[in-house]
């Protein structure tokens, strides 16, 4: 498999990308990470960029993600919002797990928001869904489907009782 080449190819698997914890709020438009490729106090930011930026890009396709290397004395994340404001988050001497936990608390959606969006996405948007809690309680309400046998009797060529009866 050609995508399994290079440094740590596990980062490009779908299972790994879906396991990301950070889903940014809808107001965030640009997410930039500034760090250096040298220095001990930048180690957590380097690991964060290496391991977590692919997950953030996968989970937030509408957000522009920037990484700026070797331009700053201290590592930081800057989030630009759609109303023109920006937020600066310091990453100095933190490990990558602390960074991701802090970002989830500050600019990430809450668990309740994610659950509500998931429920809304899965149930109501598909017109083929029917049953309890959906817009249609039975498949017979969909145009072009066979009506319920309780209301309209089925034709004889559709009834197993007549098809498979001994002649």
From Swiss-Prot:
Cellular compartment(s): Mitochondrion
Keyword Plastid applies: no
Pfam families: L51_S25_CI-B8 (PF05047)
GO annotation, cellular component aspect: mitochondrial small ribosomal subunit; mitochondrion
Record keywords, A-Z: Mitochondrion, Ribonucleoprotein, Ribosomal protein
SMART domains referenced in this protein's UniProt entry, alphabetically: L51_S25_CI-B8
Domain of life the protein comes from: Eukaryota
MF-aspect GO terms: structural constituent of ribosome
GO annotation (BP), single: mitochondrial translation
Oligomer and partners: Component of the mitochondrial ribosome small subunit (28S) which comprises a 12S rRNA and about 30 distinct proteins.
Family to which this protein belongs: Belongs to the mitochondrion-specific ribosomal protein mS25 family.
Protein name (record): Small ribosomal subunit protein mS25
Biological classification of the source: Eukaryota, Metazoa, Ecdysozoa, Arthropoda, Hexapoda
Gene from which this protein is expressed: mRpS25
């Amino acid at each position: 498999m050609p995508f399994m080449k290079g440094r740590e190819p596990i980062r490009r698997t779908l299972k790994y990308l879906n396991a990301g914890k950070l889903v940014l709020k809808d107001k965030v438009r640009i997410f930039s990470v500034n760090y250096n490729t040298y220095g001990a106090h930048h180690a957590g930011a380097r690991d964060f960029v290496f391991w977590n930026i692919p997950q953030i890009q996968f989970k937030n396709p509408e957000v522009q993600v920037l990484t700026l290397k070797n331009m700053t004395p201290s590592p930081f994340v800057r989030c630009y919002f759609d109303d023109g404001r920006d937020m600066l988050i310091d990453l100095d001497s933190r490990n990558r797990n602390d960074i991701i936990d802090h970002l989830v608390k500050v600019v990430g959606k809450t668990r309740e928001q994610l659950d509500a969006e998931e429920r809304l996405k899965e149930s109501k948007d598909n017109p083929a869904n029917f049953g309890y809690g959906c817009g249609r309680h039975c498949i017979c309400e969909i145009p072009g489907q066979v009506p319920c046998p309780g209301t309209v009797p089925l034709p004889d060529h559709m009834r197993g009782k007549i098809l498979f009866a001994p002649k």
